[in-house]
Amino acid sequence: MIRVMTDNAANLPPELREQYGIRELCLTYTVNGVPADMSAPFDGYAYYEAMRKGAEVKTSMISPLTAREAMEPVLEQGDDVLYIGLSGGVSGTCWGVSVVAQELRERYPHRDIRVLDSRGASLGEGLVVLEAAHLAQQGADMDTIIARASELCGKMRQLFVVDDLKFLRKGGRLSGAAALAGTLLQIKPILEGDPEGKIVVHSKERGRKKAMEQLIRLYQELVEDKSRPVGISHAAAPAEALHLATELRQAGCTGEILSVCHEPVTGAHVGPGMLALYFYSASWR
């Protein structure tokens, strides 16, 4: 049996993880120096409101011990492991898990242990994980699952609108001068995950409304199959997420739309008010 694992950056709701038997490993974070309780449900409103008021958030990768303690019991039971993780373009988590996986291969030479960098975050990662877990439940072999997941990673589009440029500046994404100018001019950058899974600026729009309209235009322009699943994540902006879902339906989307509050790990770098859209285009990376 193949056990699919991922991290909390994949933004998958508990009920979906349970349905597909997905094990979640946690990147951790602190708010004003206080460690978050990773066993408690994530209160997105409180988290992003704290950020809006100036709270300092720091995030940490999955520890080697956490990865080892998650994988080893599965291997001891005679099962194989596929870990699909947060983009190596924004985190060293996949690299760290890969190191642990290599150690475990030496201890369990008859088990198949794979690590796949999704080059995504939130549902840009999570939608791929769901597809892989579905294939595992159907009895597909590891090579088949890896091939399909890799193909989907190469098709995934991840487009973000941020509300305040200061969080990008703090994360080193923009210079202080550019962030100040953007704020004064009400410029709302649309970000995307590039071929390496790094966050880059796709385009810039004057005002929030025009930026959201551009998300829909990009969906219509780039989507490969409008019946495929689509993801939406928001950083405490549920009304806008609902509006985006409505606009997607009007644009012809017939696939399932999964909408979630954006997880705290990458949310720390894009800030409150962020709105993101995830969908499959033709293969591009």
What are these regions (language model features)?
Residues 85, 114-115:
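A glycine-rich beta-strand to alpha-helix segment
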Residues 1, 77-80, 253:
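Short loop/turn motifs at secondary-structure junctions
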Residues 3, 9-23, 28-30, 90-93, ...:
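Mixed-charge interfacial surface used for oligomerization/domain docking
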Residues 52-99, 142, 146:
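Glycine-rich phosphate- or other oxyanion-binding loops that anchor nucleotides, phosphorylated ligands
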Residues 3-66:
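N-terminal glycine-rich anion-binding loop in soluble enzyme alpha/beta folds
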